[in-house]
């Protein structure tokens, strides 16, 4: 956890601070078991008295009955496997985020408002989409899940790689045929901020079994959130409302992103968006 703020704050510190002031009431961390002692002493302790926290563990051998991790597999099973690890700790509507992405206050506010809405059916989910122009790295190209939507609901997420600035300042990516294609700056993309209700765990467990049947012996295969969401949408089992945010994403994708991020956090503190001491 790299300290990037003026007083050594991590990106996760900002996310948790924004979540608290947006109305979230608990944080569940998904970590490796061998990281537990350091995590509890160096990271968790600072949140004490600010918000309830729980820790769950992701490991390669956390598999359904009838499956065992192939010898030599070291790669985690993916983002949706990490979500599944939280099943016993989560009993209410919840948001999923990456610990190393800065999402911004507005993102948590729109997510909290949507998750607070009464629901009368299963599969009523949401996600926050960023404008791709607000997610670029000055250090190089990025990969993003481009969101295709209909009437405000997600139709599909298509992973696009090699997204960067062209010589004329426009945004482009490399398609599956190796050709450069333009992306409008306001194109919505997923930064892995999803909003689910607990029925998502039930479908995910069943889908994980099917994933393992096909991929158990593939050492690099991963069980990703967008894959499961796409399955549920295509099967008519879920709708995913696409929420928009005015926030600008940033993170340390490349080493030369770090000074840029440090400067941005300094500006946010100087402007009063964040207090001198958050925790």
Which stretches of residues belong to each language-model region?
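Conserved core of the sugar-phosphate nucleotidyltransferase
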Residues: 105-194, 198
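Short beta-strand-to-loop acidic/aromatic patch adjacent to the donor-nucleotide binding site
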Residues: 92-102
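N-terminal glycine-rich phosphate-binding loop and ensuing alpha1 helix
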Residues: 1-44, 51-53, 92
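Hydrophobic packing residues within well-ordered alpha-helices of enzyme cores
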Residues: 39-43, 111, 204, 261
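Short phosphate-binding loop-to-helix
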Residues: 47-93
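A structural signal for short hydrophobic beta-strand segments in well-ordered beta-sheet cores
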Residues: 1, 146-149, 242
